[in-house]
């Protein structure tokens, strides 16, 4: 039997959800939030309903650092079907063009070369990017096409996995803002046959290991059979969301000053500048600060627990 709903609680950390297929990221976010009975929750970059895989969910104070995960690199495995283009560039859309598939593995591997490194990508109309305050997908559903500017992205790795015509499987390591559906659609055009996504799984966000993910079904089972506090054991610490930033350990005096929101002058022997993750003298994560060029610690996003 499901636990009766109670007043929300202050719970803090990052939950690595293995998102199920067929649900929007926001819908599954709300379900996870209810299971944890959390006052505050947010995800770190939406996955399409068709997609599965890693969706870090920030609870409580972790929401202050969700942008760092949104801006981080992602890794995906995608299966594309060659020969058909759809209006959404995935299997959930309507087929708009069908062409013969006359390409082999060698041609595909050659075509992949032009998609590696720093490239420009025109976002799909079926995206949450906004034009005049309205998401592009709302225009698309009305049959309206809005002119979009190409955006710079980086494909760090584009690995050929398998080709069993007409299905092609790839692994992609990419920067923020990359649309895998658009990548597949563009590849289909280069190959001359068209293509769309049939399977998409996010394997990694930042440095989070795939082994740390938990399915919603398993989380739900835990919530029904274990005390609420047992769920908290599956939350990762707040500072994991900003693990890519340099670490700065403070003295007791500096910790006290930063706790009052004060800027602190310090001897920057390591010459660290820009954003850092701050830890107190007793190794407690305090938040994120900016180190200025005149060696001042300027608190920006601080934990309040």
From Swiss-Prot:
Keywords: Isomerase, tRNA processing. It catalyses: uridine(55) in tRNA = pseudouridine(55) in tRNA. It comes from the Bacteria. One of its GO terms (molecular function) is RNA binding. Its EC number is 5.4.99.25. One of its GO terms (biological process) is mRNA pseudouridine synthesis. The active site is at 48 (nucleophile). The keyword Isomerase applies. InterPro entries: PsdUridine_synth_cat_dom_sf (IPR020103), PsdUridine_synth_N (IPR002501), PUA-like_sf (IPR015947), PUA_sf (IPR036974), tRNA_psdUridine_synth_TruB (IPR014780), tRNA_sdUridine_synth_fam1_C (IPR015240), TruB_C (IPR032819). Pfam families: TruB-C_2, TruB_C_2, TruB_N. Belongs to the pseudouridine synthase TruB family. Type 1 subfamily. HAMAP family: TruB_bact. Responsible for synthesis of pseudouridine from uracil-55 in the psi GC loop of transfer RNAs. This is tRNA pseudouridine synthase B.
